Amino acid sequence: MTPVETLSLPRTPTIADIAAGERVCPVCSRSNRSEYVSLDSLPEDLQKLIRANAPGKSDDCEEVCGRCARLFERAKEHIIKDAAMQKDGSHVLSTPLRLDADERFTGEGVCIAFLDSGFYPHPDLTQPDNRIVAYRNLPDAEKDLSSLFKPDVASWHGMMTSVVAAGNGSLSNGFYRGIAPAADVVLIKLARTGRISDQDILDGLEWVLENREEYSIKIVNISAGGDAEKSYLNDPLSQAVEECSAAGILVVCAVGNAGHLPNHPVVPPASAPSCIAVGGLDDNNSINRARRGMYRSSYGPTIDGLQKPEVIASSIWVPAPILPHTPTAKQAALLEKLDKSEDEKLHDVIRENPGVDPDLDAAVGLLVHNIRQIIALKIGQENVINKHYKYVDGTSFSAPIVSSVAAQMIEANPNLTPSDIKRILISTAERLPHHEVDRQGWGVIDPRRAVEMALSLS
């Protein structure tokens, strides 16, 4: 057997390959002309893991490409020990695993600023080391980092975006981590409520420009949209984005979630020329390329005729943290406990946790199989992975994934400019077949190839 670690990366099959009978990996749907690994030649636990996460009938999976063998071999212990398992036996995979991120780089030494509605000092950012190097509350300047420990509704969004990018997965033994789990973060609260205006974002960018050297800010993530379509030629917010880029700060923006609307508008700051506007990928919680589709993300051309988004990244089934000390956290903890409890203990667990979930309170007198159905339904409805994490969706989470890859690239090659990073991400992206180019730009980011290209330019 060819050693797993020496196999080269397979490529995505073309129409010509398929027509010619090219072999396609049953797990990732990539093509590789010669380098396949027989599952029977792998350790039994690795065989079971690969079969459990292969689409379709697992018994039909007899061999996989070297890329998949390496990927699951690297992550085997983590998946078996820490990944949540779904009812079909497959696992809730992490973002780095699904996108095959390069584990050699963690964003160490790179600072990402997040502009959002609110934040929380989540353990995935603060344990074992606190990587929140600064917090700024623009509407309430007197409030410091200690005020973050009082969570409110506005805390959710920014907590999730920052952790999706830079969380180290401390509450999952490192499994549900971001692609840049060692990056430093600056958290900038833009508004008192969830509504964020053009002026709020502009104020945030101006703060970043004024403080970029003190905190060595290299990337700004903006998972928020402005008020309306505007030309970048006379829009102050777009001009601020251009100023950031000229100052050496990469600006990454969520393109929005209006792809289902007739005009599917792209608004500032995502419509600014130099930013990386990120659209949405639906990968169905799988590494199988054949299962990839588009999310309902907004798309251009912009009012100025610019192609937006430039790239797409996972925007559904994205593991993100649950805000601690909230009713949602209590509900998730109870659902996980019930899901893992033996049948004879279900009624007692519900009685011991009154008031957490009214539907569960009402189910305490039902038969066990009925309670199991309610638990499964609740876990699905609430997108619960476990007591600490849940699924989220939206391009608000695609953008921080791209920001985290950019942090890896800067760690690999600190001399990269914002335009270099954008060019590399575009040139290494992979287009989805059978989907409009306008919707996806240059396609799905490929973190591993992007980092390799960044290294090659150093």
Language-model regions, residue ranges each:
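Short recognition patches in nucleic-acid-associated and regulatory proteins
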Residues: 7-57
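Subtilisin-like serine protease catalytic core
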Residues: 100-136, 148-199, 216-218, 246, ...
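Substrate-binding/access-modulating region of protease and related hydrolase catalytic domains
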Residues: 190-274, 284-285, 303-306, 383-399, ...
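Short Cys/His-rich "knuckle" micro-motifs
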Residues: 35-39, 73-78
